[in-house]
Amino acid sequence: MLRNNIKADFHIHSNWSDGSMGIPQLVRYAKALGLEAISITDHDTMAGQKEAIEEGKKHGIWIIPGAEVSAYNSETGRKVHILGFNVRDMDGLEQACRPFLLARHRKNLQSVDLIAAAGYPINQNDVVEYASLGGTVYRQHIMHALVDRGLSPGIYGPLYTKLFGSGGLAEIKAQYMNAEEAVQLILDCGGLAVLAHPFQYNSIDFIPRLAELGLSGIEYQHHTQTPEHQEEAIQAALHHRLFLTGGSDFHGFYSEKALPPGSTGTEFAQNHPLFDDFINF
C-alpha cells in the first residue's frame, strides 16, 4: 500500500540509451533503495517501457512510462531536453524520434573514425559492442571502449573534454528536434511534457513559450540545480501553473556524478499529476 508521500525518481536511464544498467537490474536497484515509483526516461525511445512495467509489477514498484526527447531552442541554438510521461502512443513517439536516433548513431560512428585517425586503438566494431541493447552508439560507449583499453580512468575527465568538448577533435554537431515540436509530439502522443534540468542548458527563459504550447511541468530537483535554481523553478511553475518533478538522472557507470536513484530526495504526494494521470498499460 502506497503512503500519502511516495518516494520517487522521475529521471533514470537504462542501456536502451546511454545508461549502463538493464531494466530488470534498474528496477531491482530502485526497489532496494526504497523507491516506490520510478520513470525510466531513455533518450528518444520508449523501447524498454513494457519490460519496465512488467518488472515493476514483479517487484512492487510503480513504473511511470517516460522518455527524454533531445531537442534545441531554434532561437538560441541551445539544447533543451523535454521529458514525456505517460505517453499513450509509444509507437508514435518512437517513430518520430527514430530519424534523430539514427542521425546520432551515424554522428558518433564518424567520431569513432576521427578518434581512430588520431591514433587511438579503437574502431566502429569495438564501440558498437557497448551499445548492445538500444543499438545507438553514444559518446559514453566510445569512452567505455577507451577506458577498457586503459586510455582513461573514467568516462568523464580530460580525455572526454579533449575529444568531445568545444572544439574537440571528435566533436560533431548533433541533429535534434525543435523543442516546440518535441512538446507538441508528446502532447499528440497523449503524454505530459516536462522541461528537464532547465539550468543545465540555460533553458529556464524558454518556459513561457513552452507553457503556451502545453508544457505541463518543470524538473526542479536535479543534481545540476542549486537551491536558488530550485526556487526560481518553483516560482516559474507557480506563475505558469505547471507541476514539479525531480530525478537523479542516473546513468549507472555512465553517470557524470555517482548519484544513485532517489538521491535527489524526491517525495511526491499520491495525487501528483504523474500518478493521477497514470495509465496501467
Regions found by a protein language model. Name each.
Residues 259-270:
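Conserved, well-ordered active-site substructure
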Residues 57-208, 268-281:
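Extended substrate/RNA-proximal surfaces in nucleic-acid metabolism proteins
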Residues 155, 255-257:
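Short acidic/His/Gly/Ser-rich catalytic and metal-binding motifs that mark active-site loops
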Residues 1-79, 162-165, 171, 178-196, ...:
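An N-terminally biased module of ancient metal coordination in phosphate/nucleic-acid-related enzymes
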